[in-house]
């Protein structure tokens, strides 16, 4: 199983390579994008299969589609916004020279200067131009614009292409810090003679004739602030929607969450884990407006709290339904286009029953259900969840090790994983092993020793899930080879002993 997003879907050759090298199931995370993007992803997979047939490379199987419901994921609410300098980083080689130009746009109709991430477009930023909008039409391909960035460093921008009357594609070869009011000048006008002695030059300091010969940078898009905390700090979680704010002399830092009703289930000394356990805290006090936490980890360094990061309450019985109204709406699309649906945060057998009832309402009683076990309650109720799953025509389990490790403790993950595998084998239910399988390989191109051993254990499951990354094809190749090798001497949890050198073909010529 491989997680596929819209970026991968728009790379036909990449999809073909994933299919050829062993991708049997494509996973779509419904927490991202919309039905429009999901349909593009599914159509791209089917088109890739057709192309392989036409090339005589038919893989002999149809890739299944699993779509994960978002579920009731508890996240940090929004933070206060602030305009800070925008850093555009250029990658350098060992000699300090730019490996390649970083591309962006000058846009006289853009409201903000900001980073962008457009699928299939290499450009990574937009510089909004706030004056003399028609001046962009006078720029020539190959022309250079000069400026002093927010640090006072002299920088050059190269004109690469005219997109239209208001957008110019540009390139930079040195790291650049941008802020509102910076002046871009055509190189031939000798910027050095006009540069004001400090780097705070802005539009108000220039005469009207000078402004006519220059491009003035528009405002930077405000970004969410980040809160820094360390062991011993206090942090408030508000029960109302209040934007996250830093600490002051008189009050601690504060945040909100997207599901404030769960805060009524929290008790004194319960743990609250932030951002996949990177920050640990305990509840010190509770009132009608907020709960007060004391940060207990990290002990020596500071950690950053960002908006939209996860919140976990491993000691609290939150009693929240596993299916949201948004999930029910998404089901209408899923049953028509996918093979199975993944139910996030399965805590109780009643969650399975609720989802199955929705599938019956939609006329798809035989549709596949995959229960994702990723919470403390999910583990405690696993036996009843499995028995309920046996009453559903098509049912399986996914071991979601990310939240599961945070909720149950990293030191317990291995034992819990083993218990889930054994129980599922006993009741003859298929298992998907997920989260951080060959993640370093998929992202960097080189695996760690530990994750190779971890991936090989995936033979114990019916399927192994990989997340996306630059080297995802390499990860699929290696995982496929590992699982086929392990298959020779393992049947589920039973080991079959064979001659070592024959098993691994060490001395084959």
Task: Provide a role label for each language-model segment.
Residues 1-509:
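Non-catalytic helical/linker scaffolds that mediate oligomerization, partner binding
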């Amino acid at each position: 199983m491989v997680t596929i997003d819209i970026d991968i879907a728009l790379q036909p050759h990449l999809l073909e390579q994933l299919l050829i090298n062993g991708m049997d199931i494509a996973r779509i995370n419904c927490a991202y994008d919309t039905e429009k993007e999901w349909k593009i992803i599914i159509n791209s997979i089917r088109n890739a299969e057709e192309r392989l047939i036409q090339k005589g490379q038919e893989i002999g199987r149809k890739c299944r589609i699993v779509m994960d419901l978002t579920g009731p994921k508890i996240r940090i609410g929004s933070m206060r916004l602030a305009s800070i300098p925008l850093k555009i980083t250029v990658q350098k080689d060992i000699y300090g020279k730019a490996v390649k130009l970083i591309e962006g746009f000058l846009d006289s109709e853009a409201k903000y200067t900001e980073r962008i991430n457009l699928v299939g477009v290499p450009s990574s930023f937009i510089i909004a131009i706030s004056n003399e909008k028609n001046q962009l039409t006078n720029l020539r391909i190959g022309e250079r614009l000069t400026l002093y960035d927010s640090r006072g460093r002299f920088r050059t921008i190269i004109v690469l292409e005219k997109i239209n009357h208001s957008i110019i594609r540009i390139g930079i070869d040195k790291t650049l810090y941008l802020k509102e009011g910076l002046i871009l000048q055509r190189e031939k006008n000798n910027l050095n003679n006009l540069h004001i002695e400090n780097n705070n030059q802005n539009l108000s300091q220039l005469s009207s004739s000078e402004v006519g010969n220059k491009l003035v940078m528009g405002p930077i898009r405000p970004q969410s602030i980040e809160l820094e905390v360390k062991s011993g700090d206090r942090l408030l979680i508000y029960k109302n929607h209040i934007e996250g704010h830093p600490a002051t002399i008189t009050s601690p830092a504060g945040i909100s969450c997207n599901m404030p009703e769960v805060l009524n289930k929290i008790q004194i000394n319960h743990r609250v884990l932030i951002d996949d356990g990177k920050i640990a805290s305990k509840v010190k006090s509770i009132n009608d407006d907020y709960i007060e936490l004391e940060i207990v980890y990290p002990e020596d360094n500071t950690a950053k709290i960002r908006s939209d990061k996860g919140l976990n309450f491993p000691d609290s019985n939150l009693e929240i339904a596993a299916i949201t109204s948004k999930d029910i709406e998404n089901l209408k699309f899923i049953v028509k286009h996918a093979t199975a649906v993944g139910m996030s945060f399965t805590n109780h057998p009643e969650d399975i029953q609720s989802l199955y009832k929705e599938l019956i309402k939609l006329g798809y009683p035989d549709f596949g259900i995959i229960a994702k076990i990723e919470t403390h309650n999910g583990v405690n109720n696993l036996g009843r969840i499995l028995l309920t799953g046996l009453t559903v025509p098509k049912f399986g389990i996914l071991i979601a090790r990310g939240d599961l490790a945070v909720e149950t403790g990293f030191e317990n993950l291995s034992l819990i994983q083993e218990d889930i595998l054994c129980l599922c084998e006993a009741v003859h239910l298929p298992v998907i092993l997920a989260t951080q399988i060959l993640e370093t390989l998929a992202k960097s191109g080189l695996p760690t020793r530990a994750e190779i051993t971890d991936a090989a254990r995936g033979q114990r499951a019916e399927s192994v899930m990989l997340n996306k990354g630059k080297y995802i094809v390499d990860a699929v190749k290696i995982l496929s080879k590992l699982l086929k090798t392990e298959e020779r001497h393992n049947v589920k949890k039973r080991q079959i002993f064979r001659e070592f050198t024959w098993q691994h073909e060490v001395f084959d010529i």
